[in-house]
């Protein structure tokens, strides 16, 4: 079997020493994919390979031969999630058959940045279709176009999602780094279940332009990698301010008039929603690899969010081991830390409706901007109709109930929507993460990422145990998940969370933790069945 991908640092050193060419790196990655993705364990993480990958590699080799190096990531291959537009020969479908053949007319900002850095976009990864916003009964990692991605640690286990293929591809050693997207948990959850590192950046740090959306208030794009160092190297490429992105500008895209009538007398207009508050000077441009300090936990004050435990005894046991490792590395724990909004479940009723409102508007905007002129898909209603007409292929396992709810929503100037966004943002920020950090003078919070992977169940859908991503999702704040241990051969991670634009701090803390525990294991590609003892 072809060996797994070297790390980013190893590839960089090999290229610098002339030990390998970009073409050879790309060919090795393609060989690994060929051996594992549709053959052997059949991980099914890759939905499409880039037919131009070898030609791109040759061009990058020629640049190196002439002394030109675009960035430290020159020549490094990357796989990107199939909701990130590329204006090339590849499709961009969000896993949906409705978009097959309607190739994007331009690169997304992320794809453009990867190319400008000299990275080779090797292909697209499978995902939970439409980033898991179609149905309440979905199976993470399944799409009508791509089928079901499996977990490389045990092949009958779910990889989680929605960036399922991106996490499974890194865990399987196809490439050192991939790109995922997250609205709520879609980077950190699959990274946790597949035993790799995932960084969910602050909303606004990475441009969303050209990414098939769910939510303009919560969507973000980030790296998935085998190590924090590799993820930080990719984050340097991705984290570029973009005036075309409303979150990067820090300007809420909907103008609300104070004279707009409320739907009911009780629904008064609150302040206009906002994106995460930017530091002076705007979106920070940081070298995240400069944060890779093995002593980075010394003197750090970290709050333990006990309210986010208890959903899995296995996750709880690994979490206790992780807390001991944090102390051993020099951190000071505040245990427990109370998150004020955690005691008030009322805001939870607003979270999905906000996504439904924003999905309907966001898809129409993406289709108008990135699909070819005359495309038969221009709205969510068109996607719903396509699914109904092609139900045997698109809905063999689960329906489109969330799509139907979203289509029934009104516009983004609806006061009910505006107030709902404000309520959940307050729960995530002023009464949530910000409150916990400020009250205890903390650098970050920590909690289990999720439980060990459950079995794939296409008939009933995901068996969700629990996770810690929601507060950061509604706040628009960053998360980093790192492998912390294993139970029965299945990985379990912990998540560091912080305030707006604390991404660099979280990279520093997570790197130091990773070096302290050093638990990462290659997946065993174990066939389905009874798990081994812990």
Predicted features and spans:
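An N-terminal boundary/leader segment
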Residues: 1-65, 261, 321-324, 328-331, ...
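Glycine-rich, small-residue loops and helix-cap segments
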Residues: 18, 75, 116, 175, ...
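Loop/turn elements at helix/coil->beta-strand transitions in domains of secreted/extracellular proteins
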Residues: 21-23, 42-43, 69, 74-76, ...
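Acyltransferase
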Residues: 26-27, 58, 108, 289, ...
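Conserved hydrophobic/aromatic pocket- or pore-lining residues that grip, position, or stack substrates
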Residues: 29, 53, 75, 81, ...
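Structural helix-boundary/capping segments
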Residues: 35, 116, 120, 171-306, ...
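Short glycine/serine-rich loop/turn segments
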Residues: 39, 73-221, 246-252, 270-274, ...
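Short helix-loop capping/hinge segments that flank enzyme active sites or metal/cofactor-binding pockets
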Residues: 74-94, 257, 291, 296-305, ...
């Amino acid at each position: 079997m072809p060996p797994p991908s070297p790390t980013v640092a190893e590839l960089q050193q090999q290229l610098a020493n002339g030990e390998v060419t970009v073409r050879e790196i790309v060919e090795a990655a393609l060989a690994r994919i060929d051996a594992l993705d549709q053959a052997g364990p059949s991980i099914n993480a890759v939905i499409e390979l880039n037919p131009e990958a070898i030609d791109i590699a040759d061009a990058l080799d020629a640049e190196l031969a002439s002394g030109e190096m675009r960035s430290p990531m020159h020549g490094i291959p990357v796989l990107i999630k199939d909701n990130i537009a590329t204006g090339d020969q590849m499709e961009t479908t969000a896993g949906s058959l409705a978009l097959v053949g309607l190739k994007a007319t331009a690169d997304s900002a992320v794809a453009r940045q990867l190319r400008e850095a000299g990275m080779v976009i090797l292909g697209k990864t499978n995902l939970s279709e439409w980033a898991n916003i179609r149905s309440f009964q979905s199976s993470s990692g399944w799409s009508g176009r791509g089928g079901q991605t499996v977990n490389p640690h045990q092949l009958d286990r779910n990889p989680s999602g929605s960036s399922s293929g991106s996490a499974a591809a890194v865990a399987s050693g196809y490439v050192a780094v991939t790109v995922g997207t997250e609205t709520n948990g879609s980077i950190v959850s699959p990274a946790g279940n597949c035993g790799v590192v995932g960084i969910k950046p602050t909303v606004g740090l990475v441009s969303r332009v050209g990414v098939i959306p769910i939510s303009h208030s919560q969507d973000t794009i980030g790296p998935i990698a085998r190590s924090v160092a590799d993820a930080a190297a990719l984050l340097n490429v991705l984290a570029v301010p973009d005036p075309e992105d409303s979150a990067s500008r820090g300007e809420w895209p909907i103008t609300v008039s104070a004279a707009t009538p409320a739907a009911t007398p009780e629904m008064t207009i609150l302040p206009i929603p906002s994106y995460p508050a930017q530091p002076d000077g705007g979106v920070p441009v940081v070298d995240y690899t400069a944060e890779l300090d093995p002593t980075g936990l010394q003197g750090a004050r970290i709050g333990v969010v006990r309210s986010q435990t208890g959903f899995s005894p296995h996750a709880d046991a690994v979490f206790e081991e992780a807390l001991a490792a944090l102390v051993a590395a020099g951190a000071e724990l505040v245990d427990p830390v109370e998150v004020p909004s955690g005691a008030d479940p009322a805001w939870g009723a607003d979270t999905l409706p906000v996504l439904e409102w924003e999905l309907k508007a966001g898809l129409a905007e993406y289709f108008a901007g990135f699909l070819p002129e005359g495309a038969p898909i221009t709205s969510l209603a068109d996607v719903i109709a396509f699914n109904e007409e092609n139900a045997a292929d698109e809905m063999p396992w689960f329906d489109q109930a969330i799509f139907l709810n979203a289509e029934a929503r009104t516009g983004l100037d609806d006061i009910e929507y505006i107030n709902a966004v404000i309520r959940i943002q307050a729960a995530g920020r002023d009464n949530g993460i910000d409150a916990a950090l400020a009250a205890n003078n903390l650098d970050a919070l920590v909690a289990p990422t999720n439980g060990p992977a459950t079995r794939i169940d296409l008939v009933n859908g995901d068996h969700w145990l629990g996770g810690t991503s929601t507060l950061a999702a509604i706040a628009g704040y960053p998360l980093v998940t790192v492998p912390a241990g294993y139970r029965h051969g299945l990985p379990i991670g912990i998540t560091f969370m912080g305030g707006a634009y604390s991404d660099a701090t979280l990279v520093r803390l997570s790197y130091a933790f990773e070096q302290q525990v050093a638990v990462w294991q290659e997946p065993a590609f174990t066939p389905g069945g009874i798990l081994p003892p812990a």
